[in-house]
Amino acid sequence: AKKINELGADYLDAPVSGGEVGAKAASLTIMVGGPDAAFERVKPLFELMGKNITLVGGNGDGQTCKVANQIIVALNIAAVGEALLFASKAGADPAKVRQALMGGFASSRILEVHGERMIKRTFNPGFRIGLHQKDLGLALAGARTLGVALPQTAGAAQLMQVCSANGMQDLDHSALVRALELMANHEVAKA
C-alpha cells in the first residue's frame, strides 16, 4: 500500500466472504481496508459483487477482518462437528439433533449449511480445507507477532492438519469433522 501511495495512487485491500455461492449470486461480504475517498469511488463496483460492504479501517484492516472471519468460521465448524459427533456417538439421530438445535440459541449458518454436509457426507469443496488451513496459519503467525494466544484457533488448525495429512485438503472445510471422527473411531452419519 505504501509503495502504491508513493506513486500517487490509492490502494484498497478487499477480501471477501461468501464463497462460490456468494460470488455467483453477487451477495459476497466485502471487508475493505484503505482510504475513505478511494472506498467511496469504487464502492459502486463492490456493490456489483456483494451486499454487505464495510470499510473496516485503513490499509490492511480488510485482511485483518478476513482472518478474523476465518477464525470464527473454523471454530464454529469444529464446534458443530464436535456436537454432532457427540450426539451421534451417544445414539441420537444427528439430523434430528441438528433440527432441534436450529430452533435455539446454538443456531447458526455453520450449523445449517455445514452441519447438513457433515450429516449427508457431502464434502464437495465450497471452501477447501487447504485454503482454510493457510488462513489459520496467517492468523497464528499474526498472533505470534502481536503476542496474542489463540489456543482454539491452534486447535482448529491442528484438526485441519490431520485432514490434510490424510489426503482431505481438497475437500470442503466442513470435512474438518473427519479429523474428529478419526479420533473417536465413529462417523457422525453414514453416507
Model-derived regions: residue spans:
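Rossmann-fold dinucleotide-binding core
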Residues: 1-74
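Active-site-proximal catalytic alpha-helix in oxidoreductases
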Residues: 25-33, 54, 58-90, 101-113, ...
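Interdomain hinge/lid region at the active-site interface
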Residues: 59, 63, 107-174
